[in-house]
Design a protein with these regions (language model features):
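Internal intein/HINT superfamily modules and their associated LAGLIDADG
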Residues: 1-220
Length: 220
């Protein structure tokens, strides 16, 4: 009988935790699963987000640079890529796929880590904006927004947030856009933000957190 080959060793420790769930959120928005069934990559303009991704998975790997399609000579993006067949298969098992942009749907995240996942999703593709509405005296408006090119995924997120917070939100899609927007205003946004940033030490993209704090501290 021939010798059995060694079982593959995983680079990533597959165990749910706040940081691990945060990394899954990042991968859902800006990650990529190669069609080779082995390589996983994460791309961002923010080097801090690349560092957060690697920290959350407790790994080190080479960080490269790449350009976008419109300007191939300007390499604005950082890319972290590594090979791990066990982690790759795990990602498939929870709902990620290669070429996921428009096909992604439900992501199987444990309830206790959902808001860590959501914070990663927000840091990857979400936004927060605020302004004073000139139509009304002392009317300070602020919105929390999540986006996805997959209608099924954005509907799943809305359903989960409704179950977990009672927040209804609103889904919209511009006529000339391929992206769905899930938006929460004022009280609903505050409720979700408190759950996303439940301590001052949670792993997050500092510039987004600082923007939120600056806006809300000026009003509340």
């Amino acid at each position: 009988m021939g010798k059995r080959g060694q079982k593959p060793k995983g680079k990533v420790k597959i165990k749910w935790s706040p940081n691990f769930a945060y990394a899954i959120g990042l991968l859902v928005t800006d990650g990529n699963l190669s069609t080779d069934g082995y390589h996983v990559s994460f791309t961002s303009k923010d080097f801090e987000l690349i560092a957060n991704f690697l920290k959350s998975l407790q790994i080190n790997c080479h960080i490269g640079r790449k350009a976008n399609g419109s300007n191939p000579s300007e390499k604005k993006y950082f890319v972290a890529q590594f090979g791990d067949i066990l982690f790759y298969k795990f990602l498939l098992s929870i709902g990620l796929t290669p070429n996921k942009t428009k096909t992604i749907s439900v992501i199987n995240v444990p309830n206790r880590y959902f808001f860590d996942f959501l914070r990663g999703h927000f840091d990857g593709d979400g936004s927060f904006y605020s302004y004073w509405d000139k139509r009304w005296r002392s009317s300070f408006m602020h919105y929390l927004q999540f986006v996805s090119a997959s209608e099924k995924h954005i509907l799943w997120m809305r359903t989960e947030l409704l179950k977990k917070t009672g927040c209804v939100g609103h889904i919209s899609k511009s006529k000339n856009s391929s992206v769905y927007q899930l938006r929460y205003a004022k009280r609903e946004s505050l409720k979700i933000l408190k759950k996303m940033y439940y301590t001052n030490t949670v792993l997050c993209l500092s510039r987004k957190k600082d923007k939120i704090n600056k806006a809300l501290n000026s009003r509340y």
